[in-house]
């Protein structure tokens, strides 16, 4: 008589069924962990963004509030808005341009940077509290 050293078909089906049950339980659990991690990451990003905005406007004596972040369907940020007292500051971003509209007495206080047209190594923005004007570090107001 031949000595068989293997699993029967029934044993293999039982093992596959057990693995399928474990996978059916484990996959939603892991998906839940990923969702929680993404939400925590988003919350930390927004907190960091709000802190950076508050620090950038700390010397103005104006209250920063109402942070709103708009994203496209893929989660890419397209617009950031916040209130500086009653004035709205808007940072709009597209594929090849970023437009910052800063608080001022008129709507002309706006700077657009177009990556397709402008050669940009670095741009440092500063705010002169005496003249109440923004400058881009290149002598442009």
What are these regions (language model features)?
Residues 29-51:
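Aliphatic-rich helix starts adjacent to a transmembrane/signal segment
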Residues 3-31:
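N-terminal single-pass transmembrane signal-anchor helix
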């Amino acid at each position: 008589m031949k000595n068989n050293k293997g699993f029967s078909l029934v044993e293999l089906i039982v093992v596959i069924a057990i693995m399928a049950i474990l996978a059916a339980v484990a996959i939603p659990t892991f998906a839940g962990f990923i969702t929680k991690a993404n939400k925590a990451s988003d919350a930390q990003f927004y907190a960091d963004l709000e802190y950076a905005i508050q620090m950038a406007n700390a010397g103005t004596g104006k209250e920063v509030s109402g942070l709103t972040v708009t994203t496209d369907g893929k989660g890419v940020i397209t617009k950031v808005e916040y209130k500086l007292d009653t004035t709205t500051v808007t940072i709009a971003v597209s594929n090849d341009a970023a437009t910052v509209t800063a608080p001022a007495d008129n709507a002309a206080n706006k700077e657009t940077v177009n990556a397709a047209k402008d050669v940009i190594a670095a741009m440092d923005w500063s705010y002169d509290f005496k003249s109440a004007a923004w400058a881009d570090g290149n002598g442009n107001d």
